[in-house]
Amino acid sequence: MHISIVAVGKLKEKYLIAGINEYTKRLSAYAKIDIIEVADEKTPERASELEEEQIKEREGGRLLAKIPHDAHVIALAIEGKMQSSEQFAARLDELATYGKSKVVFVIGGSLGLSKQVMARADETLSFSKMTFPHQLMRLILLEQIYRAFRINRGEPYHK
């Protein structure tokens, strides 16, 4: 399976980079993992709703340009479907079983994802009703993907 994470913004925090590198290394035994970053837009402090939508559209255009046409796209969004780690593992296994060899997870910027990106998504996933920094979501997502592969292979993993 080839898994890509397409995300808005460049990581700067060393602790996040270290964690992402660790999980990318661990996952290399199970799948090919790519992390693709697209430029984020500066959001004015008191941006209007229209300005925020325009920013999401510009970021969304960059995200869509990085998604292969034959990929199964999972958008991370608060309004997405919540799953347990076991359900998420079963879903990844199901995608592999049905020949979905390219899976792309999309993480938006601080304003979220554009309507165009949400329309392109084959499904949406939520990790919580809480809001997390989009940079941190990359690490959380990688950990859950790693956990899913361990669950699917019957390998021990900390609960």
Swiss-Prot record:
Catalysed transformations (reactions): pseudouridine(1915) in 23S rRNA + S-adenosyl-L-methionine = N(3)-methylpseudouridine(1915) in 23S rRNA + S-adenosyl-L-homocysteine + H(+)
Predominant cellular place of this UniProt entry's protein: cytoplasm
EC assignment: 2.1.1.177
Localization: Cytoplasm
Main function: Specifically methylates the pseudouridine at position 1915 (m3Psi1915) in 23S rRNA.
Assembly mode: Homodimer.
Descriptive protein name: Ribosomal RNA large subunit methyltransferase H
Source taxonomy: Bacteria, Bacillati, Bacillota, Bacilli, Bacillales
Gene label: rlmH
